[in-house]
A protein has these predicted regions:
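Long, contiguous binding/interaction regions
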Residues: 1-56, 60-114
């Protein structure tokens, strides 16, 4: 089990430095299947697509993601439809990735394994 599951997202209002690429790769090893991408503004994001058998399962998963996100005070961008859900996570206040993003990713993965 990832040590990230035992942590809580810390409120972030900016003022901290986003992870550099070596920190990102270190933390990426702690969350399975999450891809890293960088947008046109050079901001890093975590990205993962989850596959389901139908719309109802996708919706149930997204509702659970919403509950965890509210509990953690850290909110991903979510796209979903019939048989899939796509989650994108970043720390908007610092325009990059922080430990919060990986904590949330680990907790989202726990929904699937539960």
């Amino acid at each position: 089990m990832s040590d990230l599951l035992n942590k809580k997202c810390a409120p972030c209002k900016g003022g901290i430095i986003p992870f550099d690429i070596s920190q990102i790769h270190k933390y990426q090893k702690k969350v399975d299947g999450w891809d890293i991408f960088k947008d046109k503004n050079e901001i890093f994001f975590l990205n993962k697509k989850f596959i389901f058998d139908n719309f109802s399962e996708s919706q149930k998963f997204i509702n659970n993601v919403g509950k965890i996100s509210e509990d953690e005070g850290h909110h991903p961008d979510i796209t979903f439809g019939w048989g899939y859900a796509k989650i994108i996570i970043t720390t908007h206040a610092i325009k990059g990735l922080s430990e919060n993003d990986f904590i949330l990713a680990a907790k989202i993965d726990q929904i699937i394994s539960a």
